[in-house]
Amino acid sequence: AVCVSLLGAANIPPQPLNLYQFKNMIQCAGTQLWVAYVNYGCYCGKGGSGTPVDQLDRCCQTHDHCYHNAKRFGKCNPYFKTYEYTCNKPNLTCRGAKGSCGRNVCDCDRAAAICFAAAPYNLSNFGINKKTHCK
């Protein structure tokens, strides 16, 4: 349940660098501001449960699962692992050894950013009550 969950809020301690990298990937791949994904649907933002409300929310669910899988390999912490990538709008390229922690995390973020850019954004799914809609 990471999808942009810790990005950009005011008056909070500095956040893990890879979340800043994820924010930058989102900006590279699409036109929507990253903050639009912070509290969207059942899976974008902190936590995640229930059935995704739409295609965009499924992107966040997939990203959560991708991070979960990355953590299963060695001592990989996707929330703190930085990585190398290039952005040539709207193209993103992950660098580093395939199968490494950094590359796996980068691939998760890249796939999510591309998915976000391709999915329709439904404003009515922003800020929904997760307790009632995400069971």
From Swiss-Prot:
One of its GO terms (biological process) is arachidonate secretion. Its main location: secreted. Expressed by the venom gland. It catalyses: a 1,2-diacyl-sn-glycero-3-phosphocholine + H2O = a 1-acyl-sn-glycero-3-phosphocholine + a fatty acid + H(+). Its EC number is 3.1.1.4. SMART domains: PA2c. Disulfide bonds join C28-C87, C42-C134, C44-C60, C59-C115, C66-C108, C76-C101, C94-C106. PROSITE patterns: PA2_ASP (PS00119), PA2_HIS (PS00118). One of its GO terms (molecular function) is calcium ion binding. InterPro entries: PLipase_A2 (IPR001211), PLipase_A2_Asp_AS (IPR033112), PLipase_A2_dom (IPR016090), PLipase_A2_dom_sf (IPR036444), PLipase_A2_His_AS (IPR033113). Keywords: Calcium, Disulfide bond, Hydrolase, Lipid degradation, Lipid metabolism, Metal-binding, Neurotoxin, Presynaptic neurotoxin, Secreted, Signal, Toxin. Pfam families: Phospholip_A2_1. This is Basic phospholipase A2 10. It comes from Bungarus fasciatus (Banded krait). The lineage of its organism: Eukaryota, Metazoa, Chordata, Craniata, Vertebrata.
